[in-house]
Regions:
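A short beta-loop-alpha structural element at the N-terminal edge
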Residues: 10-24, 156
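Conserved GNAT-fold acetyl-CoA-binding loop/helix
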Residues: 24-51
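A short helix-loop-beta-strand connector motif used in the catalytic cores of GNAT acetyltransferases and
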Residues: 51-63, 80
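Conserved beta-strand in the GNAT
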Residues: 63, 69-85
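Conserved acetyl-CoA pyrophosphate-binding loop and the N-cap/start of the following alpha-helix
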Residues: 90, 94-102
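Conserved active-site alpha-helix within GNAT-family acetyltransferase domains
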Residues: 97-98, 118-136, 141-145
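Conserved GNAT acetyl-CoA-binding A-motif
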Residues: 106-118
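Domain-level signature for soluble enzymes in the chorismate/prephenate branch of the shikimate pathway
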Residues: 157-248
Length: 248
């Protein structure tokens, strides 16, 4: 008998023999959500084969079942909730909440997830359960090339989770700044070798403006007037570093 009582659900980790049913539920859910989510970019048989080949030693797949069988699933890899799907005919009955609470119990220190920007029902669901939106992108990093949002549940110690996220971003930022400085230096070398003007005297305001505009388009959120002064400093300091290196 079907029920909307989440206490009637049973949860268990998936076994390889379950993955065919997981693929069925995934395909049904994505089809039913066509107004909120873009279509998958690969043929259904390829998607099915991919799901049926999941390595359950790397990817945790948790099933929600009742007396009628599989009604939902969630997948976790490391500190990421990679997916959470409920059978279309069982949505709105507390199953998604139960799966999300299961994920919270399995990852008490917090986890992140990606959701399409167009999927407003899912974004609202996650916000109601305490998740926060941390990042918006133009979708160039996902197969569908559709704008998406990185959300996070910061766990039972939110400040610790968020500061760890900042530390991770700063580590990547340091690497990117080093690359930016090196590339700026290489460009100045090419300029001067061709008889042009390098350093601060050779700054190209039109190109710098185009860089800022491209960055703002790529990652919606920070406005041009916020990004422009940051890039002015980054470019300026990289040029100063190049000029200083020529005096050594």
């Amino acid at each position: 008998m079907r029920t909307d009582d989440p206490d009637a659900l049973a949860f268990r980790p998936a076994e390889p023999s379950d993955l065919s049913q997981v693929a069925d539920l995934f395909l049904a859910s994505r089809t039913a959500a066509s107004e909120a989510m873009p279509p998958v970019t690969r043929p259904w048989d390829v998607v099915r084969g991919h799901i049926e080949a999941w390595d359950l030693g790397v990817r945790e797949v948790w099933l929600a079942e009742d007396a009628m069988g599989l009604v939902g699933f969630a997948t976790l890899t490391g500190s990421w909730l990679e997916s959470l799907y409920v059978a279309p005919e069982r949505q709105g009955m507390g199953i998604g909440t139960a799966l999300l609470e299961l994920a919270m119990g399995l990852r008490p220190d917090g986890f992140g997830l990606w959701v399409f920007a167009s999927n407003t029902p899912a974004r609202g669901f996650y916000r109601r359960h305490g998740l926060i939106e941390l990042e918006h992108t133009d979708g160039s990093g996902n197969p569908e090339r559709e704008p998406d949002v990185r959300m996070a549940w910061p766990g039972h110690a939110p400040m610790t989770y968020l500061r760890n996220e900042i530390d991770d971003v700063d580590a990547h930022l340091a690497e990117l700044l080093a690359r930016r400085f090196a590339l700026t230096a290489a460009v100045q070398g090419q300029k001067t070798a061709a008889g042009g003007t390098g350093g601060h005297a050779g700054r190209d305001s039109e190109r710098e403006r185009a860089i800022v505009e491209r960055m703002v388009r790529h990652v919606p959120g920070p406005e041009t007037d916020r990004v422009a002064p940051i890039m002015d400093v980054v470019i300026g300091e990289s040029l100063t570093a190049w000029e200083d290196s020529r005096q050594d």
